[in-house]
Design a protein with these regions (language model features):
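Mid-to-C-terminal alpha-helical segments outside catalytic/metal-binding sites
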Residues: 147-148, 152-159, 168-206
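Divalent metal-coordination and catalytic microenvironments
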Residues: 8, 35, 59, 94, ...
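Short, solvent-exposed polar/charged micro-motifs at secondary-structure junctions
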Residues: 18-22, 78, 134-135, 203-206
Length: 206
């Protein structure tokens, strides 16, 4: 109904016995681009479970992406997952949700860097404002985290996401956009365009 919507990342029960049939059904709609499960709400080993990985193994067949939505302590499981499926496109959502208001956690830093070594993994620059204490922040709080993401993934595998409407818990939509735009001012217009749209078009086949 709305032509500005170019793609949807939806939920499919990847542990279902008929997962192939379900994926075929949704993939028949060209607007369906990928799958995401709220793995952050699962046990830390969720992404290494056989039934979960069986479902993920079916995604590439339908040219579907998998968004990894996790907390920092689940990064080791994500590493094991992406290593097992080198032909599957993965997107790390919300930079794995580090606590922005605290000094950078070394485990988060090391594991994100390790994850970036896999060229089939991209990172969504999103969800950061809601990872601040009491939703109080200044722009400078995010710089060390964004610096690490850019130095790890490079400018071809980072894509911006507003995390709307969840971002509204912490601030307004305009502030999220301004925050990212201000940070990206250190880069060329070409790189800025990549992060704000071009990369997403390529990664999600929009």
């Amino acid at each position: 109904k709305n032509s500005f919507i170019k793609g949807v990342v939806g939920w499919v029960d990847l542990t279902a016995k008929d997962v192939d049939k379900r994926l075929a059904h949704y993939a028949s709609n060209s607007i369906f681009k990928g799958v995401r499960h709220v793995a952050q709400a699962e046990k830390d080993n969720y992404l290494t479970r056989d039934d979960v990985q069986h479902g993920i193994s079916k995604l590439a067949k339908y040219n579907l992406t998998y968004d990894i939505l996790i907390f920092p302590q689940q990064l080791p499981a994500a590493l094991a997952l992406v290593e097992k499926f080198p032909k599957q496109k993965f997107i790390l959502d919300h930079i794995a949700k580090p606590n922005i208001s605290e000094p950078m956690n070394e485990n988060w830093k090391v594991n994100v860097k390790a994850l970036s070594k896999f060229k089939n993994v991209s990172c969504k620059l999103s969800g950061m404002v809601t990872e601040t204490k009491d939703f109080n922040f200044v722009d400078e709080d995010f710089e060390p985290y964004m610096n690490h993401i850019f130095s790890s993934f490079g400018t071809n595998r980072i894509l911006f996401g507003s995390d709307w409407p969840v971002c509204l818990l912490a601030t307004d939509y305009k502030k999220v956009i301004t925050l990212i735009n201000n940070y990206l001012d250190i880069y060329s217009a070409k790189i800025k365009a990549k992060v704000l749209g071009v990369n997403a078009i390529k990664i999600y086949n929009l």
